[in-house]
Amino acid sequence: MDFLNSSDQNLTSEELLNRMPSKILVSLTLSGLALMTTTINCLVITAIIVTRKLHHPANYLICSLAVTDFLVAVLVMPFSIVYIVRESWIMGQGLCDLWLSVDIICCTCSILHLSAIALDRYRAITDAVEYARKRTPRHAGITITTVWVISVFISVPPLFWRHQGNSRDDQCIIKHDHIVSTIYSTFGAFYIPLVLILILYYKIYRAARTLYHKRQASRMIKEELNGQVLLESGEKSIKLVSTSYMLEKSLSDPSTDFDRIHSTVKSPRSELKHEKSWRRQKISGTRERKAATTLGLILGAFVICWLPFFVKELVVNICEKCKISEEMSNFLAWLGYLNSLINPLIYTIFNEDFKKAFQKLVRCRN
């Protein structure tokens, strides 16, 4: 987003020559990140468009997120690279206004898309039956439109406030002269969505964990009922005894006398059922860990990429004595841009349908 750059007019030719290798390295690194972001998001968009199996309202949100991140890669990153390498804005104030507008709107829209996806997943888990009827392409379209409209409303006011200050021709930044404007832009674009995402994904994890445990308990009860066998004990009446209980008893207490118990208790079928139950429990635990890992990656990437930048924005613009170096400011801005590269990876890498679609696209290219 907006970051401060200084002019290199006061530098001597020798100093400029000495700094050339580092500038080339920075230029190549940032250009590589921009190219990767463009390619991966383009791949996600293409996969969703050409693969019929991916034509689902939930994936339309992911496609819209990929479009937003694609715009960041092709309309925001290249100008930022030139600005950083040149250390001054050389493209005029008209293009500066346009670049800042696209930068703020697209980055805000990308963040709000993450909130919309979190809300969509939360409703799909907690209100599956009712939400399945509402989860239509039209509903996804309304959600996407709402996200873009909110992004514009959050992003436009800071652009108007920018013109209240005296901007230099060689700078392309937004000066937050008012605390109100700083709080409005940072809370609207990041802090409120962050709180919403944290709450939703916490509830999603709890709901998913409860669902796994309920399914596991239901399977165990079903196997208990299906595994009951008839036993005879002298002149006593016939009783129903669970085979899984007998197997657990035999493992926990080897001294137990099972000679009087019917031989079917130790039958291979009973042992097979117990083994199957254990495997299901293991699979359920694996799925729970996978869900936790996925949610952790989503939240971790979002917080790591954007939190430092917005903390800097809040602190620097509220505290007049607080300063930050040009290099650190640029680094934090690009750390935020990096989220546009990570998003398509996280939201598709754990989906088998996306994996197959990507493999198909790569094979077609070859």
UniProtKB/Swiss-Prot annotation:
Residues 50-59, 120-139, 203-291, 351-366 are cytoplasmic. G-protein coupled receptor for 5-hydroxytryptamine (serotonin). Also functions as a receptor for various alkaloids and psychoactive substances. Ligand binding causes a conformation change that triggers signaling via guanine nucleotide-binding proteins (G proteins) and modulates the activity of downstream effectors, such as adenylate cyclase. HTR1F is coupled to G(i)/G(o) G alpha proteins and mediates inhibitory neurotransmission by inhibiting adenylate cyclase activity. This is 5-hydroxytryptamine receptor 1F. Its main location: membrane. Keywords: Cell membrane, Disulfide bond, G-protein coupled receptor, Glycoprotein, Membrane, Receptor, Transducer, Transmembrane, Transmembrane helix. The keyword Cell membrane applies. It is a multi-pass membrane protein. Belongs to the G-protein coupled receptor 1 family. Signal peptide: none annotated. Serotonin binds at residues 103, 107. GO terms for molecular function: G protein-coupled serotonin receptor activity; Gi/o-coupled serotonin receptor activity; neurotransmitter receptor activity; serotonin binding; serotonin receptor activity. Residues 1-24, 82-96, 160-178, 316-327 are extracellular. The gene is Htr1f. Disulfide bonds join 96-172. The keyword Membrane applies. PANTHER family: 5-HYDROXYTRYPTAMINE RECEPTOR 1D, ADRENERGIC RECEPTOR-RELATED G-PROTEIN COUPLED RECEPTOR. A motif (NPxxY motif) lies at residues 343-347. A motif (DRY motif) lies at residues 120-122. Glycans are attached at residues 5, 10. Pfam families: 7tm_1. GO terms for biological process: adenylate cyclase-inhibiting G protein-coupled receptor signaling pathway; adenylate cyclase-inhibiting serotonin receptor signaling pathway; chemical synaptic transmission; G protein-coupled receptor signaling pathway, coupled to cyclic nucleotide second messenger. InterPro entries: 5HT1F_rcpt, 5HT_rcpt, GPCR_Rhodpsn, GPCR_Rhodpsn_7TM. It is found in: Cell membrane. The chain crosses the membrane at residues 25-49, 60-81, 97-119, 140-159, 179-202, 292-315, 328-350. One of its GO terms (cellular component) is plasma membrane.
